[in-house]
Amino acid sequence: MASYEAVIGLEVHAQLRTRSKLFCSCSTAFGADPNAHVCEVCAGMPGVLPVLNEKAVEFAARMGIAVGCTVNRTSVFARKNYFYPDLPKGYQISQYEQPICEHGHLDISVGDAVKRIGITRIHLEDDAGKNIHSAGENVSYVDLNRTGVPLIEIVSEPDLRSAEEAVAYLKALRAIVVHLGICDGNMEEGSFRCDANVSLRPRGAAEFGTRAELKNLNSFRHVQRAIEYEISRQADLLDDGDKVVQETRLYDSVKNITVSMRGKEEAHDYRYFPDPDLIPIHIDEARLAEWQATLPELPQARLERFMSSFGLSAQDAEVLTAERDHAEFFEAAVKLYDQPRKIANMMLGPLQRELNQRGTSLAVSAMRPEALAELVRIIDAGLISAKIGNDVFGELFENGAMPEAFVRERGLVQISDTSAIEQAVDEVIAENPAEVEAYRGGKTKLVSFFVGQVMRKTRGKANPALVNELLASKLG
């Protein structure tokens, strides 16, 4: 592999968060019964005419502005012709020669280096349906709920040189669409997905090698592993004197391999031509200026501000700014209690643990910034220990209770009365003479044993600092 350079480009599809589809009024809501959100337009019935969703145009333009694209004042829809069971019209409505956005870029960080990745174009298109293959039955079903859902396809230049760079680019792109509010970024549900074009060339060569397109990449991990495997596969072929075939390959996440799916089509295979049922999109200067003026703070700018204003590490800032609701939650909590690093630690630790375990999102949880800020405050004030705070976090997350009232009702307030703790320390020392002798003989690591025994006697409520202080003085 040392003699080859990988050349990678990504085609990213982001489903737009519009209430209705791109060319009809059917709902875009995920999870409905099969074929519940289907009308004559998205089913491709003869004689029906599409009506463009204006909000989808706005969302596409906002994305273009966010990544430094030229937003074309005029763009045209084209028919992309191919046959597949989940494409009832026999063609996809996309854009070809005149897309809505062109010539942008996105800066990514890999290690200590910053690299600029070119964005060739962003275009609007409608999504296809979904084929469902029933196990054990010699039959496939077609669900057209997704047919006609608005997408933007974001096509990168072939500027990526490793799987790591590809994942960094994809994460940065996802953070932008989420912050803009134009896509929920859910890779598992397919609302944010990508295809990767991978080829190899001898190091120092200018010409590109033959590329393979990788599909079925529905997580960052799959993107990383599929590209790494494909690079290795192509390198082995070239080393053996074989040729790489231009084809579309499917990633098998169980076997961690890519398998041939079909020959890779060229643009002429789709016989693009302007859609006669749709007039060109015209965007005037006033509307474009309005969209530019109302663009929210973008993830990279927010990340840099979190580092400079709140003293967060690059890694912590990156995680907190990956999701818009997390970033806003963090800032709201810091406004209530000005301890940004402690707030960040609570969010990246216990809060993220609960979200992961319950498979939910912050937006629909009962936890509020006021509660998290108060929890950090009462730990700092010594009202409860950090351990108690961690132990009760799950209940606070579930019921949305305010921490101070909750711990007082449960009798969990930390014991900071020196005499009460001293009594527990004396009892532990008296009950464990062998351990005391061993400790005084040099086995100082036994202090954790004594601390644990004291905490057990006080049901975890003793102030840990006082426990350690008293043990140190009494054990000598």
UniProtKB/Swiss-Prot annotation:
InterPro entries: Asn/Gln-tRNA_amidoTrfase_suB/E, Asn/Gln-tRNA_Trfase_suB/E_cat, Asn/Gln_amidotransferase, Asn/Gln_tRNA_amidoTrase-B-like, GatB, GatB_C_1, GatB_Yqey_C_2, Gln-tRNA_amidoTrfase_suB_CS
Superkingdom classification of source: Bacteria
Alphabetized UniProt keyword annotations: ATP-binding, Ligase, Nucleotide-binding, Protein biosynthesis
Any one GO biological process: translation
UniProt catalytic activity: L-glutamyl-tRNA(Gln) + L-glutamine + ATP + H2O = L-glutaminyl-tRNA(Gln) + L-glutamate + ADP + phosphate + H(+); L-aspartyl-tRNA(Asn) + L-glutamine + ATP + H2O = L-asparaginyl-tRNA(Asn) + L-glutamate + ADP + phosphate + 2 H(+)
HAMAP family xref list: GatB
Protein name, as recorded: Aspartyl/glutamyl-tRNA(Asn/Gln) amidotransferase subunit B
